Amino acid sequence: MGGIIRAFQWAFDPSVEQIGGPTVVPRSNQWSGVLDFFLQSNHDHGSAAHLLTSGGADIVAPATLRGANRLNVAPTFNYSAFFYAGGVFHSALTGAYLELYVEEFDTAGNFVRGIDIGHFEIGYWDGWWLSGSRTWGAGGNSWVIPQNGTVAVTQGFLYRVWLDLHGDIRADGWGVFGGSGAISQAQVRFVQFDWSIDPA
């Protein structure tokens, strides 16, 4: 059995982990299928940030299942991104990536476990410069995250599948004797989850 889910049913936007006053602009609209953010380091002193924004959907394993079964999930998405990292006698980090994560709940709605089952790197740079910078964009349509973990299914249990977008920056700011700066921005447009429950 299986199907296609074409819209997020859940949104998750936890507080951004940050230090040093970077510019942080969460821009997701999960109900329109969009995960989006902008991060920029503080110009005047050291700063860092890690942002997570997620959209999810539920899959219920039928109570009539027999034997050992597994859940297979493949998200399709379009994405675009822009990154900058530069410095003079300093280092800087910029990056963004996607993860596929599944939460399992029993028939009473109690959380059982969480499983990371996929990873897709959009862009990443962590470097030190005598003097230099790197600026680049990334993008593509109809990408799929290959599932690299097994999700054993229990009859009647609920499986909440999340597409997680992560963004990172870290830089030292700019001063008289050099410094560094970083920008990370990415937008992911969710297309669908293709899923199936198959014999293990």
Where are these regions (language model features)?
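Mature extracytoplasmic or otherwise solvent-exposed domains
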Residues: 1-200
